[in-house]
Amino acid sequence: MLAELSPAVIAEVKLAATLLASKERICILTGAGISAESGIPTFRDKQTGLWENYGVEDLATPEAFARDPKLVWSWYQWRRQVVADKVPNPAHHALAQWQYHAQTSDQTVTLITQNVDDLHEQAGSAVTHLHGHLWRDRCAQCEIPYPEQSRTAYIKQDTIRFDDKLITCPHCVGYIRPDIV
């Protein structure tokens, strides 16, 4: 069901649609708000449970990984578990449809996201991730990508062990880290 909009907002939407219809290249930037509707917490939301005593800078920076890689890995394992069962919402699907239909017109719709989840891809979009991707890993030393993680392994709570031994790179023995900046 569509939300009821005021006449002023409807007029703005119609104007935007008219202006965008005549453009050949459109670039859309999305952020946390689009995935929040699917139940994914944003960085502005208060951390919950085990993580409420940590700031983002304690968990989501290269310095944090250098200081305490097991803590950072534990947090990312938790984040993966939070995201694993989430599905795209109508906004994700609308953008995917827009991209799909643009292929048969003279429009190019480029989608860029600040999000690290894969909800745009699940909806069918081609997307560029500015800050990395939650399901990819890479070596902290030589930057070689490590095989992608399966989201299905994270759906059951008992599949996550926070005390797992750190994975080392087969090329240089550096630690594997989440591919997120």
Q: Where are the predicted features?
A:
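Conserved catalytic core of sirtuin-type NAD+-dependent deacylases
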Residues: 1-181
